[in-house]
């Protein structure tokens, strides 16, 4: 009896995209406080508030993103949200005020919430049911690998540049 094929191109793409998403998330996480303090002279309370905006936005969008993914086409929603997620990184550099930075942080959190729900949904769709648990394990492993290398890389980049 042969196993259903799990390592399809679609699975490899979503796995790589998931790794890169979380790598970017963990890359910037440890250095945002430094950036806000250095560029905007933000205090600890303001930094905490700004960093929290992202997570709160991601939490708020998740139930709605689930509904949208069940109602509309999943792949385009995933790609648009992923594009927004990537584009916001450039917005951070261009932000000239804390208000704009907060707005970007909220949009970034919304896109992250949508991308993560969409990615989870898509990976379940493309995995054969007989290998779904194994595939989701590998999919989650991409997050852990990103968590292992992202902060270290971000802090290294901050110290060098």
Give residue spans per PLM region.
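Paired small-residue
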Residues: 99-107
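Helix-breaking motifs and short loop linkers at transmembrane-helix boundaries and internal kinks
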Residues: 41, 73, 94-99
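Structural signature of transmembrane alpha-helices in multi-pass secondary transporters
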Residues: 22, 51-54, 139-147
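Helix-loop boundary and gating motifs at the non-cytosolic
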Residues: 7-47
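Helix-to-loop junctions at the C-terminal end of transmembrane segments
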Residues: 61-73
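Residue-level signature of mid-helix packing/kink "hotspots" within the transmembrane helices
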Residues: 55-63, 147-148
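Cytoplasmic helix-loop-helix junction between adjacent transmembrane helices
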Residues: 106-141
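Structural signature of the two symmetry-related core transmembrane helices
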Residues: 76-90
């Amino acid at each position: 009896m042969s196993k259903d094929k799990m390592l399809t191109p679609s699975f490899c793409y979503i796995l790589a995209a998931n790794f890169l998403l979380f790598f970017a998330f963990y890359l910037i996480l440890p250095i945002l406080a430094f950036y806000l303090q250095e560029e905007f002279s933000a205090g600890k309370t303001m930094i905490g508030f700004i960093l929290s905006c992202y997570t709160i936005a991601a939490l708020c969008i998740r139930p709605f993103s689930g509904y949208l993914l069940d109602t509309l086409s999943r792949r385009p929603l995933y790609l648009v949200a992923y594009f927004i997620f990537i584009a916001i990184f450039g917005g951070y550099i261009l932000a000239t005020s804390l208000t704009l930075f907060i707005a970007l942080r909220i949009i970034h959190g919304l896109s992250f919430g949508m991308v993560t729900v969409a990615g989870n949904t898509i990976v379940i769709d493309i995995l054969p049911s007989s290998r779904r648990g194994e595939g989701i394990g590998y999919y989650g492993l991409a997050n852990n690998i990103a968590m292992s290398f992202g902060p270290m890389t971000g802090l290294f980049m901050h110290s060098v540049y």
